[in-house]
């Protein structure tokens, strides 16, 4: 594992505990403290547990602002190259082909804007883990992006944010 700091290990273990007990969660801390690394460690741990026969591993989905899609792929490749990532980007026909041909165990990465357009593509899919990065992006529960995120079926849902509540408590509720 690439977790180097004690608080990162604590965060990773907390995420595992949430996952194992059927809870979702919000990992909220200041920028640069390693939320991405903790999530990558969780994905890798889940994949390794599945290979050991502890449970079935499905695909996972990371939803983030468009500006972070390639960063997620780069970070996963850097810290856990054994995890196959697939970007769900491009024209609608390309995205449709990508989603239809994804394999179990892959991590799909897409943006909020593309998810809200493509939500029908994901309707019959089950994900092991759904991560929403920069979760404050969906602080308004009435937006198409927020509705799209909530339509995804996943065993474990995790929100990452540096600003969980900016103005109203309802912003926190709208995340999940």
Language model region names:
Residues 1-176:
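ASCE P-loop NTPase motor core, strongest for the SF2 helicase catalytic module
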């Amino acid at each position: 594992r690439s977790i180097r700091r004690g608080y990162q290990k604590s965060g990773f273990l907390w995420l595992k505990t949430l996952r194992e007990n059927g809870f979702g969660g919000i990992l909220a801390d200041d920028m640069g403290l390693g939320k991405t690394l903790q999530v990558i460690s969780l994905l890798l741990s889940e994949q390794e547990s599945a290979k050991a026969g502890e449970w079935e591993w499905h695909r996972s989905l990371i939803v983030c602002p468009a500006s972070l899609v390639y960063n997620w792929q780069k970070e996963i490749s850097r810290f856990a190259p054994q995890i196959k990532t697939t970007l769900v980007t491009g024209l609608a026909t390309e995205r449709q082909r990508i989603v239809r041909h994804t394999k179990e165990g892959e991590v799909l990465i897409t943006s909020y804007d593309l998810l809200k357009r493509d939500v029908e593509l994901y309707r019959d899919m089950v994900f092991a883990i759904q991560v929403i990065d920069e979760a404050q992006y969906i602080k308004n529960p009435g937006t198409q992006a927020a509705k799209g995120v909530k339509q995804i079926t996943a065993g474990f849902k995790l929100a990452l944010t540096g600003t969980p509540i900016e103005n109203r408590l309802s912003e926190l509720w709208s995340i999940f």
